[in-house]
Amino acid sequence: MELASARLLRGQIPWRGLLLTASLLTYWSPLTTAQVTVDAVPPNVVEEKSVLLLAHNLPQEFQVFYWYKGTTLNPDSEIARYIRSDNMSKTGPAYSGRETIYSNGSLFFQNVNKTDERAYTLSVFDQQFNPIQTSVQFRVYPALQKPNVTGNNSNPMEGEPFVSLMCEPYTNNTSYLWSRNGESLSEGDRVTFSEGNRTLTLLNVRRTDKGYYECEARNPATFNRSDPFNLDVIYGPDAPVISPPDIYLHQGSNLNLSCHADSNPPAQYFWLINEKLQTSSQELFISNITTNNSGTYACFVNNTVTGLSRTTVKNITVFEPVTQPSIQITNTTVKELGSVTLTCFSKDTGVSVRWLFNSQSLQLTDRMTLSQDNSTLRIDPIKREDAGDYQCEISNPVSFRISHPIKLDVIPDPTQGNSGLSEGAIAGIVIGSVAGVALIAALAYFLYSRKTGGGSDHRDLTEHKPSTSSHNLGPSDDSPNKVDDVSYSVLNFNAQQSKRPTSASSSPTETVYSVVKKK
C-alpha cells in the first residue's frame, strides 16, 4: 500500500478537498501532548460518496499506528498500518481497496455504502511503544432521488372541501418539507400534513391557494427538491366593476367604459345598452355622445369553466350645457317694510337653482321664503340691509350659468330709525346722558342749599340767565302787602339720542321745575 502523499502527486485521489486537508496535516504535526482524537468529515455520508477520518494530536515521535474496523483490535479487523521508521504503509485483512492511509494518522474512505456504517479505531504506539487508542463513527444515508409532486386535482374549484398533494417516492429516514411560491408552508387551520409530511392537504379551497408547490426530501446527509407543481384554483367571476365611476356626461364628449371581474380562467365580457347587446369586449367606446345615449349600461361576465355569470348595471345620463338664466323682479325700488319677489327664469329643465347676494351665496333669514324648486325668492318684510345685487345660478351635473345681477334699492322708513350706530355715536349718547344726569343733580343740590341757607341766594340763582329762566310770583319786597314771594326756575335739557321707533307723542325735551319759597 502506497502512502497517500505519493499518490496525491499523481492526481489519483478523487475527493480533492479532503485529500488536500489530510496532505497538509501530514506536513504540519502539532507539537503538543494533547489527547489523540479523530473526526469523521462529514459525519453523515451519502452512499457512494467519500469520508475522511481525520486524526488530531498524534505524538510527535510515534513508532507505528493501525486502523481497525470496529472497536476490537484483532488482526482480522486491521485495515492498514503505517510504520514511521520505514515511512511506509501496509494493508491488513480488512482492507477493501477503497481506503487510503496518511502519515499523519488520517484514513480516507471512497464509495462508502451502508455496510461501512460502523465504528473505526485508531491505535498509536508512541516512542516508548505505549498504546494510545481512539474511535470514531460515521453514518451512511442513501442518495435521495428527485421527488415528484402529484395531486388528486390540479384544478380544484374554489369552495371545494379539500385538495391533496403527495411527495413521492417514499424513502426511509427522510423528512419532507413543503413550500408555495418559494415560501415555507407550516401546518395551520386549513393546512394539514400526514404520512410523515409526505402528503399536504388544503381544506376549504380558496383562490389564495393558487400557486406553485414544491416538495423537498431531506436526510442528515443530503436533500433534493421537486419541480414546481402548479395548483390552479378555478373561481369567479366576481361582480364586475365598471370604470370610470362617472354617471353624468357632457354632450359632445366621448364615452369610454371598461369592465373588470376577478375570475380564473378569465371571464368573457359583454356590453348591453338598454338591454340590447352591443359588443363582446372588455371595453366600450362611443364618441361624440348626445342625450340619446343616456340609458342603462350593463357589463355581463361569464366563466365558462365554473358556469357562473355576473352583471353590473350603470345608469348614465348625458346633459346639454345649461343656458344663462334671467331674473324678473316685482319692483327694483321698494320701501322698507314692504315686500319684493324675485323669479329666476331658465329654458333648461331638471336644473338646480341657487341664489346669490352681492356675489356671495345668499344666507336665508326668517323674512325670506323660497318656492319648492328654489326658482322664486320672496322677501317680506324687506329691510334696508336687503338692498344690493341679486343673481340666480342654475346648474346640472356637468355645467352651470349665472344670471346678470339685479340691483334692489330699499327706501328707508324714517320711523324705523338708524338700525346701525357707530361706536362713536354710541359713546356720544352715553357721555351726553351721564352729563345731563350730573347737571340735574348739581342743580337740585344748589336749590336745596339756597332754600336752607336764606333768601339772599334767590338773586344769585336768577342771575345765571344763560342756563335758567327766573320767574317771580306775587308782590315784591317793596309791596305794602308784604306777600311772600315764590320764585321758580325752569331748566330745559335736550340730549341727542339715537333715532329709534317711538310714538308720535314722544318729545325730545324734558323740563324740570324747581320752586323756592321765601318765608
Curated annotation (Swiss-Prot):
The keyword Phosphoprotein applies. Keywords: Cell adhesion, Cell junction, Cell membrane, Cell projection, Cytoplasmic vesicle, Disulfide bond, Glycoprotein, Immunoglobulin domain, Membrane, Phosphoprotein, Pyrrolidone carboxylic acid, Repeat, Signal, Transmembrane, Transmembrane helix. The modification Phosphoserine is found at residue 503. The modification Pyrrolidone carboxylic acid is found at residue 35. Residues 447-519 are annotated as: Interaction with FLNA. The keyword Lipid biosynthesis does not apply. Residues 147-232, 237-317, 325-403 form the Ig-like C2-type domain. Expressed in epithelia, vessel endothelia, leukocytes and platelets. Isoform 1 and isoform 2 are highly expressed in liver and intestine, moderately in lung, and weakly in muscle, kidney, and spleen. Expressed in granulocytes, lymphocytes, granulocytes, B cells, and T-cells. Residues 456-466 have a biased composition (Basic and acidic residues). GO terms for cellular component: adherens junction; apical plasma membrane; basal plasma membrane; cell junction; cell surface; cell-cell junction; ciliary membrane; external side of plasma membrane. The modification Phosphotyrosine is found at residues 488, 513. Residues 489-512 have a biased composition (Polar residues). Residues 1-34 form the signal peptide. Residues 484-519 are annotated as: Required for interaction with PTPN11 and PTPN6 and for control of phosphorylation level. It is a single-pass type I membrane protein. One of its GO terms (biological process) is regulation of phosphatidylinositol 3-kinase/protein kinase B signal transduction. Residues 42-140 form the Ig-like V-type domain. Residues 447-519 are cytoplasmic. Residues 455-519 are annotated as: Disordered. Residues 513-516 are annotated as: Essential for interaction with PTPN11 and PTPN6. Monomer. Oligomer. Heterodimer. Homodimer. Cis-dimer/oligomer (via Ig-like C2-type and/or via cytoplasmic domains); induced by trans-homophilic cell adhesion through an allosteric mechanism transmitted by the Ig-like V-type domain, and is regulated by intracellular calcium and calmodulin. Interacts (via cytoplasmic domain) with calmodulin in a calcium dependent manner; reduces homophilic cell adhesion through dissociation of dimer. Ig-like V-type domain mediates trans-homophilic cell adhesion through homodimerization and this active process is regulated by tyrosine kinase, PTPN11 and PTPN6. Ig-like C2-type and/or cytoplasmic domains mediate cis-dimer/oligomer. This is Cell adhesion molecule CEACAM1.
